[in-house]
């Protein structure tokens, strides 16, 4: 009799939840947009305002750093290069390490300053070192973004500083 009751109780416990469905809580993220993608399949798992145009801010520096690292990888620049700060780089606002015009730093130190301090003056100086001018570097940024399938992205500078109505990406 005890075995029958135990079997009935266990059957009840294990089957009661079968008819229930799980529902995830609505996410309340403190971000204006987001997207979550499964890396192997590319399936979008969650998105909110994923195609809304937003100011890229310092996320732009990820592309800047990618191009600098690719230039290092292909040998067009070297870790031991000395980078000279132009007037344009020294005049960048926002986050910076306050470089002065014609100030020279090792490429390695400039790169660290971009990564650690989000230094706009260093990002600009590196862009000029890689491509000759910030404008030429930004053209490379947009070409690379297209190669990566970033079809809704348009860079206007190497820093992400707000340069007017065309400075957007998503």
Walk through the language-model features, giving the residues of each.
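Sec-dependent N-terminal signal peptides of Gram-positive bacterial secreted proteins and lipoproteins
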Residues: 2-24
């Amino acid at each position: 009799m005890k075995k029958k009751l135990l079997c009935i109780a266990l059957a009840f416990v294990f089957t009661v939840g079968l008819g229930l469905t799980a529902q995830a809580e609505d996410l309340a993220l403190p971000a204006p947009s987001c997207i979550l993608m499964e890396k192997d399949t590319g399936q979008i798992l969650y998105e909110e305002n994923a195609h809304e145009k937003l100011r890229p801010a310092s996320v732009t520096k990820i592309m800047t750093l990618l191009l600098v690292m690719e230039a290092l990888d292909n040998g067009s620049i070297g870790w031991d290069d000395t980078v000279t700060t132009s007037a344009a780089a020294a005049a960048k606002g926002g986050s910076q390490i306050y470089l002065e015009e014609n100030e020279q730093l090792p490429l390695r130190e400039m790169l660290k300053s971009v990564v650690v301090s989000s230094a706009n003056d260093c990002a600009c100086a590196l862009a000029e070192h890689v491509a000759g001018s910030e404008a030429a570097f930004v053209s490379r940024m947009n070409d690379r973004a297209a190669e990566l399938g970033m079809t809704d992205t348009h860079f206007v500078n190497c820093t992400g500083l707000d340069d007017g109505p065309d400075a957007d990406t998503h």
